């Protein structure tokens, strides 16, 4: 234990001091063991402050990874746009459609249970391919469904793929991106989900639901093809002891003219330190040294879902209809605004920081939920009926857009940043399961609560959003501008 503490403190001092050091060319030659060569023969020394350039390979790899997020968004947006058509064609009751809508999150829960282990065994790339098998099969089942059973089976399979995606995509991006753009690149996960949701919100108003499933298949096939052209995560390769492949992958990501030896050595040192005791089992996760990051990860996912985000997104059409606002117009307006707002958040996440965006997002979600509570409360008592459609539109729009700007993507960024490699499987699985478990509870009960007491439901969501602000302010650290190794060293140091 003393040896491990010493190594952690040493790594912390090394990580923090590197920020202030600038290695001149002479020192770069000495540290890398290179002899003097002509400028054309020498690779550029990479300062280990993470400020390396963002190469085309990093852009391409991130884009391909978040194409899976786009597939996720298509699956999430499908239930809102297809609700009227499916209910009419297959004569589904409210309970049957609630099961169909929510079973995606149940599948996500099943996928989340195995997500960490699958990603650890197969690797990040092959895990994404594995996900697409479930997604493609699921879309085909929904497209050919003649009754509720086939609908539910297809939606469940799609959910399993989406559940594994939700873990492996942010982890993969966090492991390949330089630290000064890591937040923005991981947030692209949420951006592309919003693009998928927006697309289905818009076209779901105009095309039959079976044709909509075919549209959902197209990005899945595209994603499978593109995955063959990106490198594997260097940190996963290093964890398996495949150092040569790790350096090759890192070289491809950082550029062929960059000396990656210092970054590769830092990755190796950190993995050696964190895995000194071997792979951590789920039963061993609940130790004092892991308590702080575990509370952060699980807490954020718990609060994310109890703010009502999944229910509002899945059943936006029902909310508009209940408030007397045209659902086709409402969902189209949401779709138009969601993507630009998420793009803005993608830019701001590495400028404003995680904490600021999270608290701003929760504040806006809380106010939007409060407005919806007032709107449906007025409606139930017959007060100012002419304002109900306006309040409903503003409330639903504000809730979904503010979620997209922060609380939607940032918990996944933080999850990918705070856990060391030796607990990333068990901790990441637990955090992802928490998200999907409470997501399923919210989406399944949402329609029933909406019919029972819509005003009271949104009042609860508003109070949870307020509680989230307190949680973030006191417990969630700022991880902007730090490498994964620095974050892990600082979190370890904070509990000693």
Swiss-Prot record:
It comes from Arabidopsis thaliana (Mouse-ear cress). This is Sugar transporter ERD6. The keyword Transmembrane applies. Gene3D superfamilies: MFS general substrate transporter like domains (1.20.1250.20). Signal peptide: none annotated. Expressed in both shoots and roots. In roots, expressed in epidermal cells and especially strongly in cortex cells. In flowers, expressed in sepals. The modification Phosphoserine is found at residue 256. Sugar transporter. The lineage of its organism: Eukaryota, Viridiplantae, Streptophyta, Embryophyta, Tracheophyta. InterPro entries: MFS_dom (IPR020846), MFS_ERD6/Tret1-like (IPR044775), MFS_sugar_transport-like (IPR005828), MFS_trans_sf (IPR036259), MFS_Trehalose_Transporter (IPR050549), Sugar/inositol_transpt (IPR003663), Sugar_transporter_CS (IPR005829).
């Amino acid at each position: 234990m003393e040896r491990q503490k010493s190594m952690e403190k040493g790594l912390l001092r090394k990580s923090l001091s590197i920020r202030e050091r600038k290695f001149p060319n002479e020192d770069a030659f000495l540290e890398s063991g290179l002899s003097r060569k002509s400028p054309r023969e020498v690779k550029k020394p990479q300062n280990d402050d993470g400020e390396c350039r963002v190469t085309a390979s990093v852009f391409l790899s991130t884009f391909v990874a978040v194409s899976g997020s786009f597939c996720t968004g298509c699956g999430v947006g499908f239930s809102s746009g297809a609700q009227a058509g499916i209910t009419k064609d297959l004569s589904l009751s409210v309970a049957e459609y609630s099961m169909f809508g929510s079973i995606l999150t149940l599948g996500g829960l099943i996928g989340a249970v195995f997500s960490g282990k699958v990603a650890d065994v197969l690797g990040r790339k092959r895990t994404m391919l594995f996900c697409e098998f479930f997604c493609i099969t699921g879309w085909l089942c929904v497209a050919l469904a003649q009754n509720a059973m086939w609908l539910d089976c297809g939606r469940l399979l799609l959910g399993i793929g989406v559940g594994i995606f939700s873990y492996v995509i942010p982890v993969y991006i966090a492991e390949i991106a330089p630290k000064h753009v890591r937040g923005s690149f991981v947030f692209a996960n949420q951006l592309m989900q919003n693009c998928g949701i927006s697309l289905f919100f818009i076209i779901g108003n105009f095309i039959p639901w079976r044709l909509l499933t075919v549209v959902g298949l197209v990005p899945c096939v595209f994603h499978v093809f593109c995955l063959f052209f990106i490198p594997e995560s260097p940190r996963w390769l290093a964890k398996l002891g495949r150092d040569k492949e790790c350096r090759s992958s890192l070289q491809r990501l950082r550029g062929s003219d960059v000396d990656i030896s210092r970054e590769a050595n830092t990755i190796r040192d950190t993995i050696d330190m964190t895995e000194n005791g071997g792979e951590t089992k789920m039963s061993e996760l609940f130790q004092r040294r892991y308590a702080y990051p575990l509370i952060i990860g699980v807490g954020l996912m718990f609060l994310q879902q109890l703010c009502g985000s999944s229910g509002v997104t899945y059943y936006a059409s029902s909310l508009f209809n209940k408030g007397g606002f045209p659902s086709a117009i409402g969902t189209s307006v949401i779709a138009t605004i969601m993507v630009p707002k998420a793009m803005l958040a993608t830019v701001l996440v590495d400028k404003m920081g995680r904490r600021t965006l999270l608290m701003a997002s929760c504040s806006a979600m809380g106010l939007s939920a409060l407005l919806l509570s007032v709107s449906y409360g007025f409606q139930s008592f017959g007060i100012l009926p002419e304002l109900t459609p306006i309040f409903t539109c503003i409330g639903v729009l504000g809730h979904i857009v503010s979620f997209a700007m922060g609380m939607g993507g940032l918990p996944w960024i933080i999850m990918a940043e705070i856990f060391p490699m030796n607990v990333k499987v068990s901790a990441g699985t637990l955090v992802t399961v928490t998200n999907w478990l409470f997501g399923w509870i919210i989406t399944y009960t949402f329609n029933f609560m909406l019919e029972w007491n819509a005003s009271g439901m949104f009042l609860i969501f508003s109070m949870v959003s307020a509680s989230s602000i307190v949680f973030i302010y006191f417990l969630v650290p700022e991880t902007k501008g730090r490498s994964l190794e620095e974050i892990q060293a600082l979190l370890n140091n904070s509990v000693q």
